[in-house]
Amino acid sequence: TICYSGGCAVGASNISEGRGTPHPFLTYGAPYIDMDEFYEALLPWVDREKLLIRKKAFTPSERKYIGEICYGIELMPLCDTYDFIPLSMRILKAAADLYPNDFELVKAADGQMHISRVTGSHEMERVLEGKKDLDSLLTEWDAQSKVFAEATEQYRIYR
């Protein structure tokens, strides 16, 4: 479950988030991805004490790419406190940078990019277009998250 929120963000693109596989939201890929290249691009961002990553070819049985071989990665969290959102944004950025002719964001019925709905703003779109730095956005989100956590501390049942 810790990977679900980040997985939904990846699902806002044409990358399979592993639905219809034994490990949905832990498996990511697409037919156009070179899994060696993709793995190498993501490896520097993985804290291997908290998360394992490996290359993975898979065939989804539902949603995107049903019955097609997808190439990408599989993740295995080693703890239940890993913040998966930054890595999920790096998955999107790596795909956008490595495969600009193939990578696409998914539009909602109203024409708005689904990634903007999932993340709450158009900032990730700007990152994927090369108009904003991903590290800057992640720093902003971290600061906003801390402010929210402080403001809601007294109302939380589970800590």
Where are these regions (language model features)?
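C-terminal and late-domain segments of enzyme folds
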Residues: 1-47
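Charge-biased, low-complexity intrinsically disordered regions
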Residues: 1-16, 29, 84, 126-151, ...
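Conserved functional hotspot residues or short segments at active or partner-binding sites
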Residues: 29-139
